[in-house]
Amino acid sequence: MSGGGDESEKARGRVAAIDLGSRRIGIAYSDSARTLASPWGTVERSGDAERDRLAVVAAVRECEAGTLVVGLPLSLSGQAGPAARAALDETEALRALLGPFGVAVETADERFTTVEAERGMRAAGRTGKAARKVVDSAAAMVLLQSWLDRS
């Protein structure tokens, strides 16, 4: 007999993560073993929050995720400022939309994920406009990989 909590959590399938950018929402997802994060892509902000949320819900369902991790942009001191409060509001709205599908929604500290994603892209030679288009999904991937490594 092995530890039940871990197995039941892993049995819930893949995990998706989002990075809530001002222009784009970056999305990443895990493999079914919950060990490796990959970028899914981005949802361009439409100016309609509900439409954007529904696009995220569609992506999470496409990824067959049982859990969604929403990046929480805490300040450097760990405090929840306006951006973090907005992310918490988005988290609650997504929880209401994804709950009927059995998807758990939680938050994770996303400090430095964008910086780390940008650093990785520069190291790979991706800069400028092309890099800006994928930085949000790369940041979501960094967030998710960190979450997976801690789980």
Q: Each predicted region: which residue ranges?
A:
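Phosphate- and other anionic-substrate recognition elements at nucleic-acid/protein interfaces
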Residues: 1-16, 23-151
